[in-house]
Design a protein with these regions (language model features):
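A short helix/loop element that forms part of the nucleotide-sugar donor recognition site in Leloir-type
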Residues: 161-175
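A charged, aromatic-enriched C-terminal amphipathic alpha-helix characteristic of glycosyltransferases
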Residues: 335, 345-378
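Conserved donor-binding/catalytic core segment of Leloir-type glycosyltransferases
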Residues: 4-5, 175-191, 197-200, 212-216
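Carbohydrate-associated surface elements
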Residues: 135, 155
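Nucleotide-activated donor-binding/catalytic signature segment of Leloir-type glycosyltransferases, i.e.
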Residues: 226-264
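Aromatic "clamp/platform" in nucleotide-sugar-dependent glycosyltransferases that forms part
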Residues: 277
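Short hydrophobic beta-strand element within catalytic cores of glycosyltransferases
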Residues: 285, 294-297, 302-304, 312
Length: 391
């Protein structure tokens, strides 16, 4: 079977790159797999597989529709698996709507509701959808009931993220008397980290021996066009006078730390927190969860089903609309503070939620995700499945 992957270059550190990287070895067994690699300029040269690079002066848009078009002609795949959000689909769906032998399957995330105005037409042209949450499945089916698909959660690699001895780690780093919170989120506005910093200020008034680790680096995030889109977290930490209580580990390029170090920091943590306005899945929930760490998240989007009985959900107090018609949910720092204090002061609850999180995360192996996909690919080809627009 010839499979063309489309998404962030699998060697990068983004969430989508990780999702592709985890399942790639299993997809490649007895199959010919290539990738249209977003953000990759061709260097260093990838010697392990054929990769179509997209970052060139001639390609003006990050999503590189013309490179995808070339790859389709050059490779003639049986399956095209796109791994991205839903909102960007209009940038590539015209190319994928052209009649061909391939079956287009989208493994997609949705972080807000309803499905935005502009990506709805694209649903009609995909042969099948792998939703990364039941939330996404419901929102898409409300727009296009005839869309075929199933929910396949992303994986967490047990070789990289695994449970260590928390007591020994805390002793090793002289942190036995310290409450440790972790938030593996970039400065992207949607991640809402400054509100967590506001909540931390209030937590410190009652639990002064508390620190927050922000391991995603301090690089300003950028839009696909290269403009800055995100908070200068280091400046926020200084402005809020939290320098002594917020740790900002980063690599030499000011970006995210390596996975081995990240796993240690998850294991040091007592609570994992994502205060986002919305999440398409939330990989940190399972990366921390596989180490038995409970989570706190906002009761909306995919977060509701991923956290469930594996932590605490905060009810949003307000929402705001995006320009594309979808809306994000906003939590209040006081509610975030209350949830943090509640879990910090109840070790029994932390253990209970942590066990449920670990049990859930351990089921999401890369091999199991890849098997579900490969089985479906074979069926789509055998049955010559068609998109909703051609049925």
């Amino acid at each position: 079977m010839k499979i063309l992957l489309y998404g962030d270059y699998y060697r990068w550190k983004s969430g989508y790159a990780r999702e592709i990287r985890d399942i790639l070895p299993f997809l490649r067994k007895n199959n010919d797999v290539r990738q249209v690699a977003l953000g990759y300029n061709g260097y260093p040269i990838d010697k392990d597989m054929v990769v179509y690079h997209t970052k060139t002066p001639e390609v003006k848009d990050h999503y590189a529709q013309e490179v995808l078009h070339y790859a389709l002609d050059d490779f003639n795949p049986d399956i095209v698996l796109t791994v991205q959000d839903f909102w960007m689909l209009p940038k590539i769906s015209f190319t994928l709507a052209h009649p061909g032998k391939f079956k287009w399957v989208h493994w997609g995330t949705l972080d807000s509701e309803p499905l935005d105005f502009y990506s709805r037409e694209s649903l009609k042209w995909m042969h099948y959808c792998f939703w990364q949450s039941h939330f996404a499945a419901i929102e898409c089916k409300q727009i296009l009931p005839d869309l075929l698909g199933e929910v396949i959660y992303p994986s967490v690699d047990p070789k990289m993220f695994k449970k260590l001895n928390k007591d020994e780690l805390k002793t090793q780093f002289n942190l036995n008397e310290i409450n440790i919170l972790i938030c593996n989120a970039r400065g992207q506005q949607r991640k809402n980290v400054p509100v967590l910093l506001d909540a931390l200020k209030e937590v410190l008034k009652e639990e002064s021996n508390t620190v927050l680790i922000l391991p995603s680096g301090i690089q300003r995030t950028k839009t696909d066009s290269g403009d800055f889109d995100g908070y200068d977290l280091e400046r926020f930490v200084g402005e809020l006078k939290l320098t002594d209580n917020v740790l900002l580990p980063r690599n030499p390029d000011r970006g995210p730390i390596d996975d081995k170090t990240l796993n240690i920091q998850y294991n040091l943590a007592d609570i994992n927190i994502l205060p986002s306005w919305g999440e398409g899945f939330g990989l940190p929930f399972i990366e921390a969860g596989i180490s038995g760490v409970p989570s706190i998240g906002v009761d909306c989007s995919a977060v509701r089903e991923i956290v469930r009985n594996r932590g605490l959900l905060i009810k949003p107090r307000a929402y705001t609309y995006n320009l594309d018609g979808s809306k994000y949910q906003l939590c209040h720092p006081d509610d975030l503070k209350d949830a943090i204090l509640k879990l910090l002061r109840d070790k029994g609850k932390r253990i209970k939620y942590g066990k449920e999180a670990e049990k859930f995360a351990k089921k999401l192996t890369p091999e199991s995700r890849a098997k579900l996909m490969l089985d479906r690919f074979k069926q789509l080809i055998k049955e010559d499945a068609q998109p909703a627009s051609r049925r």
